[in-house]
Curated annotation (Swiss-Prot):
Stated family: Belongs to the imidazoleglycerol-phosphate dehydratase family.
Gene name as annotated: hisB
Catalytic activity field: D-erythro-1-(imidazol-4-yl)glycerol 3-phosphate = 3-(imidazol-4-yl)-2-oxopropyl phosphate + H2O
InterPro entries cross-referenced by the UniProt entry: IGPD_sf, ImidazoleglycerolP_deHydtase, ImidazoleglycerP_deHydtase_CS, Ribosomal_Su5_D2-typ_SF
Enzyme class, broadest EC rank: lyase
Assigned GO CC terms: cytoplasm
Protein name listed in UniProt: Imidazoleglycerol-phosphate dehydratase
Pfam family, one: IGPD
Length: 194
């Protein structure tokens, strides 16, 4: 089974995370950042992963450190769970609508970390959550998982809907990229390595 766990304890955060690629969409997520908890629930359900997170952080300052460190831990767990990446599809993409919003996520599990994000959120906050932290989370996820991640919000007027579409599309695209394809023999690259 492709799964991994991470523990991260710093002066800013205390995180325990368990991630299973071949799961059933089961989420057990407890964080001090309610909006992020909601988004990770959606990511897990729509990616058909299993994800358990217990995260505490210095949210009395703001949500930055907790959100960033969850991205770090999830990226590291994903990279470990993928192992040598033999037989995976490697690429994944998804369009997801959420009412008036439309998001697109495209992934290459290439060992070449990069985030390209095009999203113009109308609101700086959703509740108490700073919307700029979506980029921070996705960048740390891409960096630690060593994936090329492109995120485009084509349009939308409600910031919550736009971000929700991103996280659902992220789950669906990652599910596709991590899928074992019986036609793929060995590493999915003409170089023979990723």
């Amino acid at each position: 089974m492709r799964k991994a766990e991470r523990v991260r304890k710093t002066n800013e955060t205390d995180i325990e995370l368990a991630f299973t690629i071949d799961g059933g969409g089961q989420a057990d997520i407890k964080t001090d950042v309610p909006f992020m908890t909601h988004m990770l629930d959606l990511f897990t359900k729509h990616g058909q992963f299993d994800l358990s997170i217990n995260a505490k952080g210095d949210v009395d300052i703001d949500d930055h450190h907790t959100t960033e460190d969850i991205g770090i831990c999830l990226g590291q767990a994903l990279l470990e769970a993928l192992g040598d990446k033999k037989g995976i599809k490697r690429y994944g993409s998804a369009f997801v609508p959420m009412d008036e919003a439309l998001a697109q996520v495209v992934i290459d599990l290439s060992n070449r970390p990069h985030l390209e994000m095009r999203a113009d959120f109308p609101a700086a906050k959703v509740g108490t959550f700073d919307t700029e932290l979506v980029h921070e989370f996705l960048w740390k996820l891409a960096l630690e998982a060593r994936m090329n991640l492109h995120v485009i919000v084509h349009y939308g007027t409600n910031t919550h809907h736009m971000i929700e579409a991103v996280f659902k599309a992220l789950g669906r695209a990652l599910d596709e990229a991590t899928t074992i394809d019986p036609r793929v023999k060995g590493i999915p690259s003409t170089k023979g390595m990723l």
